[in-house]
Amino acid sequence: MEFKRIFNTVHDIINRLCQHGYKEYIIPPESTTPVELMEYISTIVSKLKAVTRQDERVYRCCGELIHCRINLRSVSMETWLTSPILCLTPRVRQAIEGRRDEIRRAILEPFLKDQYPALATLGLQSALKYEDFYLTKLEEGKLESLCQFFLRLAATVTTEIVNLPKIATLIPGINDGYTWTDVCRVFFTALACQKIVPATPVMMFLGRETGATASCYLMDPESITVGRAVRAITGDVGTVLQSRGGVGISLQSLNLIPTENQTKGLLAVLKLLDCMVMAINSDCERPTGVCVYIEPWHVDLQTVLATRGMLVRDEIFRCDNIFCCLWTPDLFFERYLSYLKGASNVQWTLFDNRADILRTLHGEAFTSTYLRLEREGLGVSSVPIQDIAFTIIRSAAVTGSPFLMFKDACNRNYHMNTQGNAITGSNLCTEIVQKADAHQHGVCNLASINLTTCLSKGPVSFNLNDLQLTARTTVIFLNGVLAAGNFPCKKSCKGVKNNRSLGIGIQGLHTTCLRLGFDLTSQPARRLNVQIAELMLYETMKTSMEMCKIGGLAPFKGFTESKYAKGWLHQDGFSTISYLDLPWCTLRDDICAYGLYNSQFLALMPTVSSAQVTECSEGFSPIYNNMFSKVTTSGELLRPNLDLMDELRDMYSCEEKRLEVINILEKNQWSVIRSFGCLSNSHPLLKYKTAFEYEQEDLVDMCAERAPFIDQSQSMTLFIEERPDGTIPASKIMNLLIRAYKAGLKTGMYYCKIRKATNSGLFAGGELTCTSCAL
């Protein structure tokens, strides 16, 4: 019966493709077994892939066919519950087994009727990402179904939440007298409608006995010798990497001048890390990575900046598998600005571990101590500030590393006083700000809110109330993940227990603006940009406070010593723009009175992986290209900008004219600017500019405008285009960093993406992608 239903669905999709004019690509299905039908689907999709460049209807139909293939590979509920490979935890399995009929009636049947059709028609990339990556591969080539996938996540969180007094009643739509199934249905629906998109480790491992569920791990082993650093790397770092977590590790304390007996210092440790990452990723479908944090006064700074790509000086110490981030004090930019204003002989001094106290300081305390150490002659060498700046920019542009973060902004706007015990680094993707030390890791559990699901139809508008409810649900969901999660080592468990840090981000900001008819950097879009951030921070903090006030839970450890307990809110450190009349004063008083269950709330991460299942733009970034192309082992994978394709179909009722426009776009790498020249501000296609065509200053300013309400940080990538002669404007990149510094941002540069002048379809400056934090 199930095979016949799927066969009929395939037949209906094939008929639609024929009606769209693609009969010559198709042989009608005559398959008599599931295996034959799966092979048939694979053949048809392979034939039609190239056509998706011109017809979004084919792209969506191919996605539906892949969903049929997923259904052909799926197993019964009984087989799924008892699968040794899936290995559900006993609590989750028992919770589902005891309510199977109730779950089927109240959750699964409504999903298949109401939500699944929209999910199945999102597109080819979405379907393939679920099939290849997120759905658990079971015995004999079988696959977890989408019903089972969403149920695993929702049931795991529900099982934890219903055991917390009164917490479930904080979920929108849940009242006193609720049942386990009521709560599970809310989470299931939020996941199935893609309102909440959990991080990759959560989707892969939550509810299972195997795998760790956190995305980001921050470490500072405080290693002052190579031996101690090696022990830290082969211990905790290796353990986390094998659990597929991404690592940000501060190695600033390993700051030795080379001697006869110790000639390589930090370089040798970086090489060990590089080899470890390469080995762990060599047989893994989900690669992870490491970002090493040092401050720009480290004695090995210039050597570290020559360990990747074409800048490598010594092949023995090539480290192309890891990244570096400069944890940069304000003093560096103050000196560079002094140089720009005409000051002569502006120097930057490098120190060894005799100046280790600088690692623990920030702000004025750092500056005064740095100046004193310079006067005392403890510097190892001095370099013209412009030479250091150029070396940093050249390395970022050519190799994609270093990233750059602002040490003082991160510490100044942290919820604890860190003077004398400063935060020393961030995570792999530069959006998490937590204190780590030799005894405790910083750990963050991530999820993003898909902004496109907050759009109301006819006429299209952004529903702030919907965002508010989703933000509240996400807080409860992630706290359930924290309670149920697996973590790879004791120091990670300690970090989770003490801080209960959440990292709630967004995805689909550009797509949302497109559907509203806004250019991403237009005034209406910039206003919405701030409203989204403010409402999310307010609602997440309010929900966390109510977990203490209404739910009776204890605040996070250290709350009484935190700035929160004294009435501080993150936006107090900024010149805040607000477009919403929210009762912040009342919330401030309530936090002082009742506390916060969680210590942190918002972190705007890249959503490279999960944005593929939602078919929307990544994070808060502009769309990179209106026709994304990726070559894989199975061939070229195309992902068109469906909003542009839909708009072209609406604009051109004549198919011949529409195809003519698409051919023009094809010849110009799908750039509307290159294809059609100077478009008027009111032209409907102007808003389809890509990341490299936006003024980067506007994108930095948008990050700055929402920064007061982002209590962690934002993975801000810069998109730079080569000049026609193939040169990269280093001053352009440096000016953007200065702009970010002056705006008080915490992250100045995640990736620096360079588009080649010779081929506008190519990127450079960082080909590796983090899928740990990238959701």
Curated annotation (Swiss-Prot):
SS bond partners: C216-C444
Keywords of this entry: ATP-binding, Disulfide bond, DNA replication, Early protein, Nucleotide-binding, Oxidoreductase, Viral latency, Viral reactivation from latency
Listed EC numbers: 1.17.4.1
Domain of life: Viruses
Binding site for substrate: T200, S215, C216, G246, N427, L428, C429, T430, E431, P606, T607, V608, S609, S610
InterPro entries: HSV_RIR1, NrdE_NrdA_C, RNR_lg_C, RNR_lsu_N, Rrm1
Entry keyword annotation includes Nucleotide-binding: yes
Name this polypeptide is given: Ribonucleoside-diphosphate reductase large subunit
Origin species: Varicella-zoster virus (strain Dumas)
Organism lineage string: Viruses, Duplodnaviria, Heunggongvirae, Peploviricota, Herviviricetes
Gene that specifies this protein: RIR1
